[in-house]
UniProtKB/Swiss-Prot annotation:
Pfam families recorded: ASC
Residue positions the entry lists as glycosylated: 134, 196, 303, 349, 365, 372, 473
Tissues/organs with expression: Muscle and nervous tissue.
Keyword Isomerase: no
Family assignment from sequence similarity: Belongs to the amiloride-sensitive sodium channel (TC 1.A.6) family.
Subcellular location, record wording: Membrane
InterPro entries: ENaC (IPR001873), ENaC_CS (IPR020903)
Keyword flag Glycoprotein: yes
MF annotations from Gene Ontology: ligand-gated sodium channel activity
UniProt feature, compositional bias: Low complexity: 575-591
Membrane topology: Multi-pass membrane protein
Protein's name in the database: FMRFamide-activated amiloride-sensitive sodium channel
Length: 625
């Protein structure tokens, strides 16, 4: 059968023009629609022009099967995108962090605070002076008291802490003074003095002294010559004949000579027991430092804090100090007393757990008892508060769950220092006389040291008259080298050297490197990463971009306007205005007729042996030719 071209019938279009006519139906340039069209028309129009994958296919496809297939594909893509987006949001809400290390060379380095304690808390020289001045009655009474009675915690009652808890200010009077200990001080090539130190009290070491507690000194050079150099006298005088202390085998930090040194962040609270290092006498100790800066993220990525230290305002906040104060509060709450091993909380008014109430009265009531009697025969004094403290201290040290209730977090910014310690024999015997002579004659406080006077007198007697000028004149070298010393002189020289090396030490604390290693926390998956992955997910599964979202916003705006117009009673759909007796209808029909004729003039004839049909847009049906 022969088919006739669709152009032979007016208003009938060939099949290859049908898709174009459907698109033109919803295109604003080809339809005379007003802004008050129906919601379906608006959705269809924007759907046919949408950049999202699949939506235009659903709207423009004439075949129902194609519409269903594309609809299923769009639903599948939407489901996959939703699942992946939920995983991305869950990953973001975990607020994980990564830690990066960076070496900074251009920033000034803060010099740390340096806290120094004499390892032997009590000055034997002070005890000697108080003894001869009859000022040590309480000390002697206490020593007799602990020997006369038996305690459940005998080890503690013989400790320096029990001595302080029961004698209070009398015990503090026996502690060391910086004026007696400090023989020489130099910082950054300039002299420093006692006034550059602040004093704090520790229950284990008594008086301790801090350099750079509030000055915030900055360093711009490395090496021992540009750091802090100190020469100390540890005041290791021989005890009175026949007087000896009690060695406490349960104490691992006392009963030795030297100083305990803590290098800590400027303005932070020192803890000599936990963070200190021992510096022995008779050596020159060098402590090299390298600054490390920790920068942490606050909530929600972390739990760092910028709060002040609760309870002790003169110190900066540190995690360790917060825990120590929390331990003290817990012991006070559970035992009704405080511990001298922990920092005091000013807001709590409590006595020490090791205090024996009315111990002096008890001692007087048992004055007739022999303090040399056997342990079994000694009277027993219970100490329930001390037992509670020891029990709680043990529990807190073995179980850290208490930290959850303390509310202690790491500071958001914190400086720490890596330490490397080295020792060398000091001072050499060859230079001892020159050093002692200067300290003895020029340094005011050095003249008060008994060992200094004795050592200087011994060495002065042994010195050759020309030995002091050996550096300038070697004409008497033969006399010096050929001189022989008697056994007593050699013993005198050895005793003088031993006195110097048993009492003196040199400490150098300096920066090894001006670069600061910063460990900085960064979000492992930030908001920018989330937005980037959301864009990639929507683009992969649905072809949606920001512009596509703008199209959706436009749809919402136009539908909202449609609702408002309908509430005002405005017509919806195509608008026809009758002016001059239907001239508008005539114009519309004329334009449609011209459009149909344009398609008919453009089309060609099609032929086929099976038959022919055309689509009549005026009736919306196919008609055979």
């Amino acid at each position: 059968m022969k088919y006739t071209s669709a152009a032979t019938k007016p208003g009938v279009f060939p099949e290859h023009h049908q898709h174009a006519m459907m698109r033109n139906r919803y295109h604003p340039h080809h339809c005379n629609y007003s802004d008050n069209r129906s919601a379906i028309d608006i959705i269809a129009e924007l759907g046919s022009e949408s950049n999202a994958h699949g939506l235009a296919k659903i709207v423009t496809s004439r075949d129902t099967k194609r519409k269903v297939i594309w609809a299923l594909l769009v639903i599948a893509g939407f489901t996959a995108a939703t699942l992946q987006l939920s995983l991305l949001v869950r990953k973001y809400l975990q607020f994980q962090v990564v830690e990066l290390s960076e070496i900074k060379d251009s920033m000034p380095v803060q010099y740390p605070s340096v806290s120094i304690c004499n390892i032997e808390p009590i000055s034997l020289r002070t005890i000697r002076r108080m003894y001869f001045n009859n000022e040590s009655q309480n000390l002697i009474t206490w020593l007799r008291f602990i020997q006369k009675f038996r305690f459940e915690q005998d080890s503690f009652m013989n400790s320096i802490r029990a001595f302080y808890e029961n004698l209070g200010q009398d015990a503090k009077k026996l502690s060391h003074n910086l004026e007696d200990m400090l023989m020489h001080c130099r910082f950054n090539r300039e002299l420093c003095h006692v006034s550059n130190f602040s004093t704090f009290f520790d229950g284990n070491y008594f008086n301790c002294f801090t350099f750079n507690s509030g000055q915030r000194l900055q360093m711009h050079a490395t090496g021992p010559e540009n750091g802090l150099s100190l020469i100390f006298s540890v005041e290791k005088d021989d005890p009175l004949p026949g007087t000896y202390g009690v060695y406490n085998f349960d104490n691992n930090i006392l009963h030795s000579a030297g100083v305990r040194v803590v290098v800590h962040a400027p303005g932070s609270m020192p803890s000599p027991v936990d963070h200190g290092i021992d510096i022995p006498p008779g050596y020159s100790s060098s402590v090299g430092l390298k600054a490390i800066l920790h920068t942490r993220l606050p909530y929600p990525y972390g739990n760092c804090t910028n709060d002040m230290l609760n309870g002790i305002k003169q110190y900066k906040y540190t995690f360790f100090a917060c825990l120590q104060l929390c331990k003290q509060r817990l012991i006070i709450q559970r035992c009704g007393c405080k511990s001298s091993a922990l920092p005091e909380v000013p807001s709590y008014n409590a006595t020490f757990c090791g205090v024996i109430k009315d111990w002096q009265e008890i001692n007087r009531n048992h004055s007739n008892e022999d303090h040399n009697q056997s342990e079994e025969d000694r009277a027993f004094i219970p100490t329930p508060y001390l037992a509670c403290e020891e029990r709680e201290q043990k529990n807190l040290n073995n179980d850290r769950t208490y930290e959850l209730s303390c509310g202690c977090f790491q500071p958001c910014s914190e400086t720490s220092y890596l330490k490397s310690v080295s020792l060398s024999y000091w001072p050499l015997e060859f230079y001892q006389l020159s050093a002692v002579e200067r300290f003895f004659k020029q340094e005011r406080q050095a003249g008060q040291n008994h060992f200094m006077k004795t050592a200087y007198e011994y060495l002065e007697k042994l010195a050759h008259p020309s030995q002091k000028h050996l550096a300038r004149n070697d004409s008497h070298m033969d006399d010096i080298l050929s001189k022989s010393y008697s056994l007593s002189e050699k013993e005198m020289a050895k005793e003088a050297s031993d006195l110097i090396r048993q009492n003196m030490l040199r400490l150098n604390i300096y920066l090894e490197d001006l670069s600061v290693v910063e460990y900085r926390q960064l979000p492992a998956y930030g908001l920018a990463d989330l937005f980037a992955d959301i864009g990639g997910t929507l683009g992969l599964w649905m072809g949606i971009s920001v512009l596509t979202i703008m199209e959706l916003i436009e749809l919402v705006i136009r539908l909202t306007g449609l609702v408002f117009n309908s509430e005002k009673g405005l017509p919806r759909g195509p608008t026809t205005v009758n002016n001059n007796n239907g001239s508008n209808n005539h114009s519309q029909s004329t334009s449609q007729h011209q459009l149909y004729n344009g398609y008919m003039d453009h089309d060609s004839h099609y032929s086929d042996s099976a038959g022919a049909s055309v689509f009549d847009f005026r009736r919306g049906v196919e008609s055979p030719v």
